[in-house]
């Protein structure tokens, strides 16, 4: 099965504490949980948490901001041409399966 959201996509958060925020997908995480596929994405500037880091010989301690994963069901692809969120579809062009935006029909590279 193809992934609807991949690294480098511009996405918008559709539910949760960061609803309405936009960012770029940094990493996509997939795993199985009780036989079901559970997918998460790390998005820049979204779901930021503070973490206390203990001092070591190589680095100083302190509080740092890290981006936590967000469930793929809580984000949607952002169509920059229309300025709205959109769904992802698949179609074949020259016997090659490609993703496209359902709102504008634009092919996603």
Swiss-Prot record:
Keyword rRNA-binding: yes
SMART domains named among the record's database cross-references: KOW (SM00739)
Gene Ontology molecular-function annotations: rRNA binding; structural constituent of ribosome
GO cellular component: ribonucleoprotein complex; ribosome
Transmembrane feature ranges: none
Family matches, as CDD domains: KOW_RPL26
Annotated InterPro entries: KOW, Rib_uL2_dom2, Ribosomal_uL24, Ribosomal_uL24_CS, Ribosomal_uL24_KOW, Translation_prot_SH3-like_sf
Keywords on record: Ribonucleoprotein, Ribosomal protein, RNA-binding, rRNA-binding
PROSITE patterns associated with the record: RIBOSOMAL_L24
Gene3D superfamilies: 2.30.30.30
GO terms classed as biological process: translation
Record SUPFAM superfamilies: Translation proteins SH3-like domain
Subunit organization: Part of the 50S ribosomal subunit.
Family (UniProt): Belongs to the universal ribosomal protein uL24 family.
Role: One of two assembly initiator proteins, it binds directly to the 5'-end of the 23S rRNA, where it nucleates assembly of the 50S subunit.
UniProt protein name: Large ribosomal subunit protein uL24
Protein source organism: Ehrlichia canis (strain Jake)
Lineage: Bacteria, Pseudomonadati, Pseudomonadota, Alphaproteobacteria, Rickettsiales
